[in-house]
């Protein structure tokens, strides 16, 4: 699935099952909540905190997909083409950082 397909599928899902998009501020709050759920899994599974028994069956991929879903909703609402935005962002990073990371002694 491409980002463009994902944006179309989310839009269709919202129109078919969700009635309408939540407003942008509500979706921003939801995005923050979903990112927090990903952070909790990462912190407990890969960080120094112990993982609670109730968190051991949480699916990291599913939580990341929740983040992506809400991000796509926000992109659709605000007219952002994620394919174009990601390409521009990668181009910017490539031009800005093409030698920076290679020269970073901490990464060697």
Spans of model-derived segments:
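Flexible "arm" and connector segments at domain edges
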Residues: 1-64, 68-108
